[in-house]
A protein has these predicted regions:
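Asp-box/WD-like beta-propeller blade repeats and closely related beta-sheet repeat scaffolds
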Residues: 130-168
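Beta-rich, blade/repeat-based domains predominating
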Residues: 53-69, 96-121, 153-171, 199-220, ...
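Conserved beta-strand positions in repeat-built beta-propeller and related beta-rich domains
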Residues: 54, 70-75, 108, 114-131, ...
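Bacterial N-terminal signal peptides
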Residues: 28-40
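A short beta-strand motif characteristic of beta-propeller blades
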Residues: 46-52, 88-95, 146-153, 192-204, ...
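Short loop/turn segments that connect beta-strands within beta-propeller blades
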Residues: 83-87, 141-146, 185-189, 234-239, ...
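N-terminal secretory signal peptides that target proteins for export/translocation
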Residues: 1-24
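Beta-propeller blade signature
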Residues: 132-142, 325-336
Length: 337
């Protein structure tokens, strides 16, 4: 009972923190919760947006090389799947394997796995499915959707945000409310606190770790949402090395999801932009690809197209709560500009 009360207090604190972030992030009209990005490599292209269920508030999107898209739901939970040219259909049922609200999702084709960040966000005023407490990394079979594993983030304050997978099959997980990056080695029974650093800690009234990606150089890169920053975490023999803040060529606004894009990265900025980030040494060149996006939260690459999830989260936890958010889509953006 005492543990449950502690979880409830932490959930409420997270809710207040998110409300504060809403006001600071996008004023009275927008909110972008920290989201995941995933990489796919096929040349499949589609010009029309892909619809997802009404009032599902997509919080993350990922893909496979054939152009299949997977999107999680912030409020309903579960994961929907859309084959190239097809409609979104339920793939992971809400509440499956004890899951709650779905944040980051990542398809790992090499390992045949779908990673899902599951969180109890009742403190945000969003009950979601089920009654599991805390933050979890859920793992499902990418082909069948069958549950493959469930791994709790150990800190009761944790918020499982996003996932990256290294060349050895290890999964890295960002935690928005602690200064920790967790690691799940292949075959491991639990997550380990892989990297912890004061630079990664959430600022007062801010939101910490968000996007996460393994770069072409083999190092790990992460974003923090408020204040918006980029960091490199060196990887040597599988262990975390130095944490370095990168100097950006322009100011970035609410740095959200990030994933590898060739030798660079794709970055979602919560204020409505998709950008390309190229790192050289301790500096990062930031070039805008698209702007004017409606509360974007995630992106995944399929060939020359970036599929952006416009989460419109202000309509469920922000200043637009109670208003009609309109239809939800995954929006295609050309990456050849």
């Amino acid at each position: 009972m005492n543990q449950e009360r502690s979880v409830t207090r932490n959930s409420l604190a997270q809710g207040e923190l998110l409300k504060s972030r809403s006001a600071r992030a996008l004023g009275t009209t927008g909110l972008a919760l920290m989201l995941g990005v995933a990489l796919g490599g096929a040349a499949f292209a589609q010009s029309a947006p892909v619809g997802v269920p009404d009032k599902s508030f997509p919080e993350s999107v990922t893909s496979t090389k054939d152009g299949t898209l997977y999107a999680g739901s912030f409020n309903l939970g579960g994961v929907v799947k859309a084959s190239p040219g097809g409609k979104a259909e339920q793939f992971i049922q809400p509440g499956a394997a004890g899951s709650r609200s779905t944040l980051g999702v990542l398809a790992d084709e090499k390992g045949g796995l779908l990673y899902v960040c599951s969180n109890d966000i009742t403190g945000f005023g969003v009950p979601g499915p089920g009654d599991t407490k805390g933050a979890w990394l859920k793992v499902f079979d990418l082909a069948s959707g069958a549950p493959k594993g469930s791994y709790g983030l150990p800190d009761p304050k944790s918020l499982c945000n996003d996932i990256a997978v290294g060349s050895d099959g290890s999964a890295y997980v960002s935690d928005s409310f602690t200064p920790n990056v967790y690691k799940l080695k292949p075959g491991a029974a639990a997550l380990e606190a892989w990297a912890t650093d004061p630079l990664l800690a959430p600022a007062k009234d801010g939101v910490g770790l968000d996007g996460i990606a393994v770069g072409a150089d083999g190092n790990l890169y992460v974003t923090t949402f408020i204040p918006a920053k980029l960091f490199k975490i060196a990887i040597k023999d599988g262990k975390a090395g130095a944490v370095t803040e990168l100097k950006t060529s322009r100011a970035i606004d609410h740095a959200d999801a990030m994933r590898a894009f060739g030798d660079s990265f794709l970055l979602i900025e919560g204020a409505g932009r998709l950008a390309k980030v190229t790192v050289k040494g301790d500096e990062a060149q930031v070039d805008t690809i698209a702007e004017g996006l409606a509360e974007p939260v995630s992106v995944t690459q399929v060939g020359n197209t970036g599929w952006v999830a416009e989460g419109k989260l202000s309509y469920i936890i922000g200043d637009n709560k109670g208003k009609d958010p309109g239809p939800f889509t995954l929006k295609p953006v050309s990456l050849t500009k």
